[in-house]
From Swiss-Prot:
Keyword list, A-Z: Activator, Nucleus, Transcription, Transcription regulation
Originating organism: Aspergillus fumigatus (strain ATCC MYA-4609 / CBS 101355 / FGSC A1100 / Af293) (Neosartorya fumigata)
Quaternary organization: Component of the Mediator complex.
CC annotations in GO: core mediator complex; mediator complex
Lineage, top ranks: Eukaryota, Fungi, Dikarya, Ascomycota, Pezizomycotina
Protein name: Mediator of RNA polymerase II transcription subunit 18
Length: 268
């Protein structure tokens, strides 16, 4: 698959107004999204990866084929993405089974059971993004992409077995809109208050997270996914749709092609 994109910087003071404008344009309410994004780096040369390890036995054949193609294609940084909720931030880690059993015997009239973050049941998917194509005539960012589901819980064991080491993680917070075949994501990157050598089993409070852009700005990303990137007519139509959105939003933001090297995912 291929992904075609345009990007725009959005100052903090313009965020609320742009949300309203996008809601009107797409005739839908924003779908709020929070994601954990784990960054892994390949340390093993392609052709040496065996994806049939550990919990990956639970994956379906089609998912395994996608994983094989992604992980054997070259040495890249890749992301493992998992959806989370606002309630997960600052929540205690999920108690073990015997603690749950003990709690179940307490007075039913007591307050509502607290929310726990259950890392062992955290869903994940692997997202591969190639470096954008060079010297494209179209004024959009175009890159090869793929994604596949991963086992829930601790993904470091299968990722290490596949030749990938954990590097760091961050969070993304934003709102999704759908406009015809375009996915519009108005978002910002959030850093954790401290670094970690492995994925966190417990998340800090959301107000402890710090924006990557200290000015409070956001990024507007408009993306179209094309199944057959070799079909030039389909790619041309997708580009035209992005140009149409750019024209509709030109009074508010400047959607443009990203710098190719800023999206370079190759592991050096």
């Amino acid at each position: 698959m291929h992904e075609l994109l345009l990007f725009a910087s959005v100052p903090a003071h313009q965020h609320h107004e742009l949300l309203q404008q996008l809601a009107g344009l797409t005739a839908m309410q924003p779908q709020h999204r929070l994601e954990r994004r784990l960054v892994f780096k390949a340390y093993r040369k392609p052709g040496l990866v065996n994806v049939r390890v550990g919990a990956s036995q639970d994956l379906q054949g089609a998912e395994l084929q996608r994983l094989n193609k992604m992980l054997n294609g070259g040495m890249f940084y890749t992301q493992v993405v998992g959806p989370v909720s606002e309630a997960d931030f600052g929540a205690p880690a999920s108690p073990v089974a015997d603690q749950d059993a003990h709690m179940s015997g307490t007075d039913e009239k007591s307050s509502v059971r607290p929310h726990y973050y259950d890392y062992e049941n955290q869903p994940w998917k692997l997202e591969f993004r190639d470096i954008p194509e060079a010297a494209t005539r179209s004024a959009v960012t175009t890159r090869l992409m793929a994604s596949a589901s991963l086992p829930k819980g601790d993904v470091t064991v299968p990722m290490n077995a596949w030749g990938y080491n954990f590097v760091t993680e961050y969070a993304v917070e934003g709102d999704i809109f759908i406009h015809n075949d375009i996915v519009i994501f108005l978002h910002r990157v959030l850093h954790y208050p401290t670094e970690s050598q492995e994925p966190r089993r417990q998340l800090p409070a959301l107000n402890e997270m710090t924006p990557l852009d200290r000015s409070g700005g956001y990024v507007l990303q408009a993306a179209i996914t094309v199944q057959d990137g070799s079909n030039q007519e389909t790619m041309k139509i997708a580009s035209q749709h992005l140009f149409g959105l750019r024209e509709q939003l030109k009074s508010a933001v400047r959607l443009e092609q990203a710098d190719r090297l800023s999206l370079d995912t190759r592991a050096k």
